[in-house]
């Protein structure tokens, strides 16, 4: 503690309060040796570090696949992960044509207004899905947004069965999105890849083609992450 106090130039009493708070959160651990407290990193901090490193690896492995998907569809492509029961976008590939409404990297959205979000929770264990649907309050962004947990559950069953999610203006009027799951080597869904576009280009005639290309991209990404069906 004295070393931390000297290096950070803050009083020992403040250091002690900070360390005890971090200890309660399991980010550090205390080991008394010969009557002196020795502090080291806790398991939760190590888990957090591993989680961030795995996301960095994911972005690196999937980036070329995202670029190819964006080129094939001429649409905006995103990569999202589940974080705090919401979808958090960790990467994207933009096209030259403008898209007025989209989620930036680092932003988080409720799962009911995001195709990626629906994909990420559709494959959760039953008890985890039950908890999420009972605890979350789902916003109604547009008249097309589904907010009822029972209706969402039915939609999620369809997502699981068909292997993709379709957001038809649930996030914003005039915006459509198709997402598919990325699996890791254990068979768990670790991310979702999606194509987003406006009604002007994301027409009804192109939906079937987009579904096929997004699912193909997700399958390629899953193989890169070690998944073998």
What is each of the regions a protein language model found here?
Residues 1-60, 224-227:
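N-terminal helix-turn-helix
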Residues 8, 19, 45, 66, ...:
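Short amphipathic alpha-helical/adjacent loop interface patches that line ligand
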Residues 12-15, 42, 117, 129, ...:
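Alpha-helical structural signal
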Residues 28, 91-93, 193:
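Short hydrophobic alpha-helix segments
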Residues 34, 40-135:
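Amphipathic alpha-helical effector-binding/dimerization core
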Residues 130-131, 136-137, 215-229:
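Cysteine/selenocysteine-centered motifs that mediate thiol-based redox chemistry or coordinate metal-sulfur cofactors
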Residues 144-217:
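Extended hydrophobic
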């Amino acid at each position: 503690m004295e070393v931390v106090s000297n290096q950070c130039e803050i009083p020992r009493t403040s250091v002690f309060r900070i360390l005890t708070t971090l200890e309660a959160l399991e980010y550090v651990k205390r080991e008394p040796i010969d009557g002196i407290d020795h502090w080291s990193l806790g398991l939760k901090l190590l888990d957090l570090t591993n989680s961030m490193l795995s996301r960095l690896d994911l972005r690196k492995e999937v980036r070329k696949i995202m670029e190819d998907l964006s080129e094939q569809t001429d649409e905006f492509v995103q990569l999202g992960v589940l974080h705090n029961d919401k979808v958090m976008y960790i990467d994207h590939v933009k096209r030259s044509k403008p898209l007025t409404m989209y989620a930036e990297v680092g932003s988080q959205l409720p799962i009911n207004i995001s195709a990626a979000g629906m994909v990420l929770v559709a494959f959760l264990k039953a008890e985890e899905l039950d908890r999420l649907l009972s605890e979350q309050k789902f916003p109604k962004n547009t008249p097309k947004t589904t907010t009822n947990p029972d209706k969402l559950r039915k939609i999620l069953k369809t997502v699981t069965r068909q292997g993709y999610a379709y957001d038809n203006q649930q996030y914003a009027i005039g915006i459509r999105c198709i997402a598919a799951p990325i699996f890791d080597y254990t068979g768990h869904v670790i991310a979702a890849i999606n194509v987003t576009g406006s009604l002007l280009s994301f027409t009804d005639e192109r939906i079937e083609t987009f579904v096929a290309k997004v699912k193909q991209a997700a399958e390629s990404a899953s193989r890169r992450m070690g998944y073998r069906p």
